[in-house]
């Protein structure tokens, strides 16, 4: 699924998603007038109780059958503005001015901000529905799938009989392209894939025929094929139910595929607004241009990670990474891993040369994190071998030699997995040095401060705490913690998946520079195939615990051998 450019160069055509979701002929924008207006936000201002203003007079209109992309990075105020449509204000904030007016399909007009708590609860899920980023937040793990949708109907007194509600459950399951069988409705959430869970969440949101749908980054973390299915479902359900949808995201590539109109927010202000093709292909504001310039593209034409420096310089100085007659730096041989009777990795073979960056690609449930953790000694229950410079590594990191522990370092998806919120950054980064027991405290501090500079943080960050840092700064500190013992291999587990595109680009640039300067080898675990040419020299594609494609980046992307890889490539959203 890609977004093509019109012959006149003025913008994209949406044939792929438009046609695949039932649109007839060429894409045409929804009608916007007083009759189709559903939600109007005017001069909305929110502030902290100390008086700091967070939203500075935001105006948003939503119309029936339209999807509006509300775009911005962390701290832009996009989620705060979107949640106001639900009558929700985050703890510590208060509305100081403005109105939120809902025009229901039954002809009623509602002042959302004047509703009582009971009235707001009644409105949510019936007139205004919400789909969170993580389906686990909308699905009760202790309730069967069908019962959860039925509960929404029961709470809002849908229909006149139990049989009518039961039929509505089956109808909405069919609408989101999931089975409506008794067996499927009786499943538990953990028995569904991430994409299936998200589609159940969409079914719950549409069960009561809402007027407005608020979607808060609902495809973050999904592989591109699953993301494509979810986006099609959102588009289909919006068109079929004549709903006004607000899609909150930092992913402009997804916006280009899905929405009719784009609103860009920066620090509590709307800085640009217009039809999707005008904003994405002829942006007026510098911030919009910055966001667009940071989107990773499969072709690698945008140099978001500084890879030209790697290609031209590292090989000249250190020698290009290439298959060696000797043992590779890191080698995985016939690795298998099972949880009880469930085998999640099937005979994995993988090799990483010195200075090489391998992108390990897979969807949720593919086994990629299990493999990464096994390599790092964090999943000791595997069979098979992991070797470093030809020497077999103990299965558990605790049983590995000090040199082996120092040589292979793991960076978690969440920086808080390695940064203790009660410790300063310097104290957390010092832990590997303390455990090694080879340096004085003064020497440890010197190394930590030098490493802070290496990850482009000031030495003053030594005395700051994780909660005081932005998401990108915390991830840099987590990378620094992995670097203090001068490893040869960094295992990076989805470390940019939760970051804004510009912050992601800065982390990719940092990793490229570290490889250039230190000759590091990387195993970069991700579900995002568009990052391949920006971070990797090789790609290994993992599907259901089996590596189905493996080779140099250009070979895998230009000539994929497996249908799964071809499917991923066909479904990449792009601009």
Regions found by a protein language model. Give the residues of each.
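Helix-to-loop junction immediately C-terminal to a conserved catalytic motif
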Residues: 86, 90, 376
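Conserved ABC transporter NBD signature motif
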Residues: 94-110, 384-392
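ABC ATPase NBD coupling module
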Residues: 107-129, 155, 278-283, 393-409, ...
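Conserved ABC ATPase "signature" region
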Residues: 164-183, 443-460
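Conserved ABC ATPase signature
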Residues: 188-192, 196, 465-469, 473
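ABC ATPase "signature
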Residues: 273-274, 550-551
């Amino acid at each position: 699924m890609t977004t093509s450019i019109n012959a006149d160069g003025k913008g994209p055509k949406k044939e792929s998603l438009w046609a695949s979701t039932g649109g007839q002929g060429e894409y045409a924008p929804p009608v916007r007038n007083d009759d189709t207006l559903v939600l109007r936000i005017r001069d909305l201002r929110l502030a902290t109780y100390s008086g700091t203003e967070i939203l500075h007079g935001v105006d948003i209109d939503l119309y029936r059958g339209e999807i509006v992309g509300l775009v911005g990075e962390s701290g832009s105020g996009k989620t705060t503005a979107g949640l106001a449509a639900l009558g929700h204000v985050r703890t510590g904030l208060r509305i100081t001015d403005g109105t939120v007016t809902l025009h229901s399909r039954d002809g009623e007009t509602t002042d959302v901000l004047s509703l009582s708590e009971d009235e707001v609860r009644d409105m949510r899920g019936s007139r205004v529905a919400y789909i969170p980023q993580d389906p686990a937040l909308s699905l009760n793990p202790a309730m069967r799938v069908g019962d959860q949708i039925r509960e929404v109907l029961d709470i809002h007194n849908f229909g006149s009989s139990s049989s009518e509600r039961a039929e509505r459950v089956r109808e909405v399951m069919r609408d989101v392209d999931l089975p409506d069988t008794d067996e499927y409705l009786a499943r538990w959430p953990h028995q569904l894939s991430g994409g299936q869970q998200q589609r159940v969440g969409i079914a719950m949101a549409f069960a009561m025929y809402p007027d407005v749908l608020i979607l808060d980054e609902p495809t973050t973390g999904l592989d591109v094929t699953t993301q494509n299915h979810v986006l099609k479902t959102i588009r289909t359900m919006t068109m079929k139910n004549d709903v006004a949808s607000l899609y909150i995201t930092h992913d402009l590539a997804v916006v280009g595929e899905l929405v009719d109109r784009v609103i860009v927010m920066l620090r509590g202000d709307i800085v640009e607004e217009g039809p999707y093709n005008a904003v994405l292909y002829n942006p007026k504001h510098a911030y919009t241009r910055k966001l667009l310039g940071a989107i990773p593209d499969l072709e690698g034409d945008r140099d978001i990670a500084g890879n030209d420096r790697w290609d031209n310089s590292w090989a000249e100085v250190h020698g290009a990474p290439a298959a060696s007659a000797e043992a590779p730096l890191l080698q995985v041989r016939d690795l298998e891993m099972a949880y009880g009777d469930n085998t999640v990795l099937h005979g994995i073979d993988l090799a990483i040369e010195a200075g090489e960056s391998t992108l390990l690609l897979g969807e949720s449930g593919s086994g990629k994190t299990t493999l990464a953790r096994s390599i790092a000694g964090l999943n000791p229950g595997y069979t098979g071998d992991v070797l470093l410079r030809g020497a077999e590594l103990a299965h558990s990191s605790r049983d590995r030699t000090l040199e082996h522990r120092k040589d292979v370092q793991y960076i978690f998806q969440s920086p808080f997995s390695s940064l203790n919120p009660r410790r300063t950054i310097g104290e957390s980064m010092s832990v590997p040095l303390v455990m090694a027991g080879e340096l004085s405290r003064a020497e440890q501090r010197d190394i930590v401060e030098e490493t802070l500079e290496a990850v482009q943080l000031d030495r003053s960050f030594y005395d700051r705490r994780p909660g005081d840092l932005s998401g990108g700064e915390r991830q840099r500190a987590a990378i620094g913690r992995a670097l203090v013992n001068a490893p040869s291999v960094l295992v990076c587990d989805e470390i940019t998946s939760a970051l804004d595109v510009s912050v992601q680009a800065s982390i990719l640039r940092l990793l490229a520079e570290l490889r250039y300067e230190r000759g590091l080898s990387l195993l970069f675990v991700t579900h995002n195939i568009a990052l391949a040419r920006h971070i990797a020299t090789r790609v290994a594609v993992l599907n259901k615990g089996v590596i189905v494609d493996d080779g140099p980046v250009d070979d895998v992307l230009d000539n994929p051998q497996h249908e799964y890889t071809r499917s991923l490539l066909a479904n990449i959203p792009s601009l």
